């Protein structure tokens, strides 16, 4: 059973929305590649088209567009997705997932390329009580 979390970003507003895709809905994304445009109707976004921009598997291994295939490989990386060097010229061998979306993926990142009739705010209403709580630290004061 394939369960994916599809994170859909709206470039107009800058907001991101989470879509939980179970077996049937995940079929719209599984088998596609990073950079493919997909109809988002099966994900509950009627009329929308999304562009797959990335993702990661259950171990947190990121997917890289430049790596063809469907598996995981160790690559010597100097920059880009999966590695951010600290020093100039630094390289490191890192585990990277290939660009084809498989059932091992847990999260798929996408952005909207074509909009439907309803806005994303209408499709994903705000949940009451989901506001960010202000973090306050109680200080111990000596008396």
Curated annotation (Swiss-Prot):
Q: Which GO terms describe its cellular component?
A: ribonucleoprotein complex; ribosome
> Which Pfam families does the UniProt record give?
Ribosomal_S6e
Instruction: State the Gene Ontology BP annotations.
Output: translation
Molecular function (Gene Ontology), one example: structural constituent of ribosome
InterPro entries, alphabetized:
Ribosomal_eS6, Ribosomal_eS6_arc
The UniProt record lists the keyword Ribonucleoprotein: yes
Which key words are in the record? Ribonucleoprotein, Ribosomal protein
Q: Which family does it belong to?
A: Belongs to the eukaryotic ribosomal protein eS6 family.
Q: What is this protein called in UniProt?
A: Small ribosomal subunit protein eS6
What is the protein's species of origin?
Methanoregula boonei (strain DSM 21154 / JCM 14090 / 6A8)
**Native organism taxonomy:** Archaea, Methanobacteriati, Methanobacteriota, Stenosarchaea group, Methanomicrobia
């Amino acid at each position: 059973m394939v369960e994916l979390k599809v994170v859909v970003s709206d470039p107009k507003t800058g907001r991101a929305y989470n879509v939980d895709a179970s077996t049937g809905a995940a079929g719209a994304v599984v088998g596609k590649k990073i950079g493919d445009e997909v109809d988002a109707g099966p994900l509950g976004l009627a009329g929308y088209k999304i562009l797959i921009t990335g993702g990661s598997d259950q171990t947190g291994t990121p997917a890289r567009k430049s790596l063809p295939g469907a598996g995981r490989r160790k690559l010597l990386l100097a920059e880009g997705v999966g590695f951010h060097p600290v020093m100039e010229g630094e390289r490191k061998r890192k585990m990277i997932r290939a660009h084809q979306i498989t059932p091992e993926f847990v999260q798929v990142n996408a952005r909207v390329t074509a909009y439907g009739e309803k806005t994303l705010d209408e499709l994903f209403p705000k949940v009451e009580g989901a506001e960010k709580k202000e973090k306050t630290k109680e200080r111990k004061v000596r008396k």
